[in-house]
Swiss-Prot record:
CDD domains: ABC_PstB_phosphate_transporter. It is found in: Cell membrane. GO terms for cellular component: plasma membrane. Gene3D superfamilies: P-loop containing nucleotide triphosphate hydrolases. It is an enzyme of class 7 (translocase). Residues 7-248 form the ABC transporter domain. This is Phosphate import ATP-binding protein PstB 1. One of its GO terms (molecular function) is ATP hydrolysis activity. It comes from Lactococcus lactis subsp. lactis (strain IL1403) (Streptococcus lactis). It catalyses: phosphate(out) + ATP + H2O = ADP + 2 phosphate(in) + H(+). GO terms for biological process: phosphate ion transmembrane transport. ATP binds at residues 39-46. It is a peripheral membrane protein.
Length: 253
């Protein structure tokens, strides 16, 4: 059965001032899959990820050509509201970034911005989001304690719950486990595998093991170019490009 495309990147190039950081990228992200972006530092993988919900717009020197099509529209169209876009395409960062509020208020933050005041609804969203983020059992008795008192791995899962509360379609993750200990990282990986049943996920990772464990497709990037994009098994066991093989085998990176 053919997979449903959720988002398509077409001829995307990005410049920081005159420096080209992405060079004519073409790729498609598919529904209910995890796509891993791999490559050495500075290859453009985080820049590509941030392009998908227009986080690069916040950098004054950036210019972008090409298109990213989502729900039949180019997200770079002037008609697209970036606030609405980022509700549908949420992002989890490398360092957990909970707000200095209670766990409960972190999760409902986006709903409160939308004017939701129904306590029963907020309670339900908090429980469902924390369960989906694989952390409910750890925090259900301390919901009104500060999220800053949690471990790094717990904070990262609360940040995931905060995104889930506004019901996104796509979740972007920029090295979400690199600042975590191995046990915490494994819990976040478990969470991602559960979440892909309901969401589409794109992750930047420096860990070949992580990419091979959790992703359905892998894109290898080098010097702003998309070198190879295929199902993860093919990328790791039978890469078509020599650069991909060299990177995966540790010859550079």
């Amino acid at each position: 059965m053919e997979k449903e495309a959720v988002l398509t990147v077409s001829d995307l190039s990005l410049y920081y001032s005159k420096k080209k950081a992405l060079n004519t990228i073409n790729m498609t992200f598919y529904k209910n899959e995890i796509t891993a972006l791999i490559g050495p530092s500075g290859c453009g993988k985080s820049t590509l990820l941030r392009s998908i919900n227009r986080m690069n717009d916040l950098i004054p020197t950036v210019t972008i050509t090409g298109a990213i099509d989502y729900k039949g529209k180019n997200i770079y169209s002037p008609k697209v509201d970036t606030v609405d876009l980022r509700k549908e395409i949420g992002m989890v960062f490398q360092q957990p970034n909970p707000f200095p509020f209670s766990i409960y208020e972190n999760v409902v933050y986006g709903l409160r911005l939308k004017g939701v005041k129904d306590k029963a609804l907020l309670d339900e969203v908090v429980e469902n989001s924390l369960k989906a983020a694989n952390i409910w059992d750890e925090v259900k008795d301390i919901l009104h304690s500060s999220a800053l008192g949690l471990s790094g791995g717990q904070q990262q899962r609360v940040c995931i719950a905060r995104i889930l509360a506004v019901n996104p379609e796509i979740i972007l993750m920029d090295e979400p486990t690199s600042a975590l200990d191995p046990i915490s990282a494994a819990r976040v990986e478990e969470t991602m595998l559960e979440l892909k049943k309901d969401y589409t996920i794109a992750i930047v990772t420096h860990s070949m093991q992580q990419a091979s464990r959790i992703s359905d497709r892998t894109a290898f990037m080098l010097d702003g170019n998309l070198i190879e994009y295929n199902d993860t098994k093919s990328i790791f066991l039978n890469p078509e490009k020599q650069e991909t093989s060299d990177y995966i085998s540790g010859k550079f990176g």
